[in-house]
Amino acid sequence: NCKASKEEIAKSLEGSWAEDHLFELEQAFDLYNFIQEQVNKCDRQIEMHLIRYRAKLDHPSDDNFQRCKKKIGKKNAVDFDVEKYAFDIWKVNIMAIPGMSAISLLQLIGELGHNFADKFETCHSFCSWLNLVPNNKVSGGKLLSSKVPKKTNICGQVFRLCANSLKRNKTTLGYYFRRIQSRCGYSQAIVATAHKIAKIFFTMIKNRTEYDESETGINERDLLERKITMTQRRLDKLNRQLEVALV
């Protein structure tokens, strides 16, 4: 953020400028404006397709839309209400899921459509299609290997990007990411959190239920209290063993 006023900026530009430098600056400014104009045209075209797609759906009008309260970045954001369009298509506010962005919503709408949940029997089959479920190889009741197959799925990549944005997030999903990262590593945390987001996404749309953070897992405070309780029990056990040894 620029802290200087317009007057200060204008005054700092006063001076003797070479003609070729001014020409280069003018060219760069014109190019920037041209690119912004093309981006705005793309936004309008995308919105036009969303309007047409929404009109084809046999969905009754719903006035129960409630905008999520999380902060949404405005840098390079589209200039139309993606959150409302997604709600009109899926009838739940997917933007409420931590890590979900307007760009992610647009990609999921374009790749999945409105009735994708009917094409998967279970949430597990959907996550498996996203390539977010490890391919467990079991022999004789023993787990030999558990790796996620190396195949590309665009929607799966979207959920991975959503998971990556939760590294410092203070929601339960953010705590979940950091807990898995401390135990298994960064890559495993990305896949595990993306899997969890995908399950929430599918369940919300399949059951037409809004996002409920209380059902996504324990928060960091509860986890800390559990660790304190377990540590206290271990200390008590050690104290008892020490008392027996000293007798």
Predicted regions span which residues?
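A detector of single, family-specific signature residues
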Residues: 1-247
